[in-house]
Amino acid sequence: MAAGARAFESFPKGTRRPTAVLCMSDMVAIGVLGAANAAGLRVPEDLSVVGYDDLPMAAWTSPPLTTVRQPIVEKGRLAARLLIQRLQGKVVTSPAPLSTSLVVRGSTSRPSGSSRTQGEASEFVGEKEVS
């Protein structure tokens, strides 16, 4: 969560402030939620936040976190199976990507008071590496 708060602090301010943030994990997104709240921003009215993982706590944040659900248990089983095959000396091919789904909750909405219209390109502010 601290990584999300640190990333939030590096975002541009004022008119260049992003209207949405897609985080690498729910834990980072929860940190962004807290930092946005501390900065006086309203989520989702001023800033939309999306996490990744769909951890159980994502449904209990305020507001509830929109997130990308991944099949974590299936991912673990697949990793274990591939590891065992490699340890047995078998040739392992890359598996097909596992499916994900968007779980829309309360942390996302259209930008409020935005002059952007549907289909208009928005600016990519950049990636922030968190540690």
Walk through the language-model features, giving the residues of each.
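Flexible loop/turn connectors
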Residues: 5-119, 123-126, 130
